[in-house]
Amino acid sequence: MTDAADAIEREAMEYDVVIVGAGPAGLSAAIRLKQLDADRSVVVLEKGSEVGAHILSGAVLDPVGLDALIPDWRDRGAPLDVPVTSDSFYVLGEEGRVRVPNAVMPPLMSNHGNYVVSMGNVCRWLAEQAEGLGVEVFPGMAASQLVFDDGGRVKGVVAGEFGREADGSIGAGYEPGMELHGRYVMLGEGVRGSLSKQVIDRFDLAADAEPQKYGIGMKELWEVDPAKHVPGKVLHTMGWPLGSNAGGGSFVYHLNDNQVYVGFVVHLNYKNPYVNPYLSFQQFKHHPMMAELLEGGKRVSYGARAITEGGWQSLPRTAFPGGVLLGCAAGMVNVPRIKGNHNAMLSGKAAAETAHAALEEGRGSDTLTEYDREVREGPIGKDLKAVRNVKPLWSNYGLTASLTVGGASMWMNNIFGWSPFTNAHGKSDADSTEPAKDHKVIEYPKPDGVLSFDRLTNVAYSFTNHEESQPAHLKLRDPDKPVEVDLKIYAGPSARYCPAGVYEFVGEGDDARFVINFQNCVHCKTCDIKDPAQNIVWTTPQGGDGPNYPNM
């Protein structure tokens, strides 16, 4: 049975393990399951048009997860061919910059031995490895519903439904999709996954955790002047242009072929509803340091994705009746390192090993508490626990406290293996937003079309596409709240926090109305996270829709 009380009959396919999401976590789980038992039936469902189409990450990859999963990845041609050659960190002012010496940074912050990568390309390669082992990988298959057994345990998902009309009715070319049942179901949907969110709520997995915290990460791929390009150069910044308005910072990673990733992250616990994360990103590129790098270059692509930032304190239980949460579906990002892919891969491997052992014992559809224990007590938990104070110190006391006290906490963990305190996160990001009357409007420079770009122009470079005849996948719990609450109390922050220009208010006063341009959506999930009234619900559109990120 499904939670949706429809009378649609669907065919069912049976597997040992059903995995939702062809990201680093899901593909690692699939590979490890097949390594352990070549006869195990494993399927991976991916909502993107191809594997990697929806993958957006920095990324500087710590290969520890890949080393554990596929030790001979170098011989197999994994796309990790740009080792980090330099690593620097700056605090920016509007015109100047101050470098933080590497010597004062805790050793865990070093990127020595890491690689600048396109995680989309890494996932494409992982999918090839999985398919070579016999894993069935189905791109363009959006998992839209959970399937439960008579005991209320997760036993599968509904995937591949197409052809509903805009009003939700069944169209002429309707395809009901199918149910894919597994003895275990692994959810590797990434940040704020729609099915993951449901199981966290249904099974109260976050009962003993603090509210999850998030950031919105935006990224552009640039081709720059060869004279300015240094393969493997890694640079991070904090400070300007966010100042005291919000936490966050930038990353600048040099790949090969004169390509550079330019990214910007804004923590979503900001108070002032006039903060515009996207325009902050565009403003950042006009800093003299960035302008010098980008002048004469060309922006190639753009994307945006939410990031989990709660870490150790916000980690929910990762096992539930019938399945597990993988990677960022649970929240495994090490915030000061700006890395989560290594933990995602380690989580997939751990989930596969615990599921394999359970299946060998004849078990199925139970709660894999062994996996949750491994997440907390193994390498993932140790990685997150060591940096647990950085994000809450930043949120509660500002950048200086994060750099000094948070840095001291990391040094203590490095030297002594422990820190004497654990800071609390406090409010959710939605609850952190304050009424507009308590804040001043923030004026941002207009994009110049050379270094900086308006949202709609940039969204075209995400190569996003949605079938416009389908129902909008962005749902409102109450259609009146966007105007009555979002606009009248908070001055319409949805028109600013969305990095794709999905939301806008048309008209003024009593004539104001809320417009959802869902065809622009890049699936970042910021609206589902930051909406002060928690009135916007992100659901999955038809499979194959959304962004099509190349080399991102």
What positions do the PLM features span?
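N-terminal Rossmann-like FAD-binding beta1-loop-alpha1 element of flavoenzymes
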Residues: 17-43
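N-terminal FAD cofactor-binding segment of flavoenzymes
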Residues: 36, 47-96
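Glycine-rich phosphate/pyrophosphate-binding beta-alpha loops
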Residues: 116, 329-342
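Predominantly flavin-linked oxidoreductase catalytic cores and closely associated redox partners
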Residues: 120, 124-125, 129-292, 350, ...
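FAD-binding beta-loop-beta segment adjacent to the flavin cofactor pocket
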Residues: 304-335, 458-469, 482-497, 504
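Active-site-proximal substrate-binding core of FAD-dependent oxidoreductases
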Residues: 331-337, 349, 353-398, 515-517, ...
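C-terminal auxiliary extensions adjacent to catalytic cores
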Residues: 394-450
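Iron-sulfur cluster-binding cysteine motifs and their immediate structural context
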Residues: 488-519, 525-548
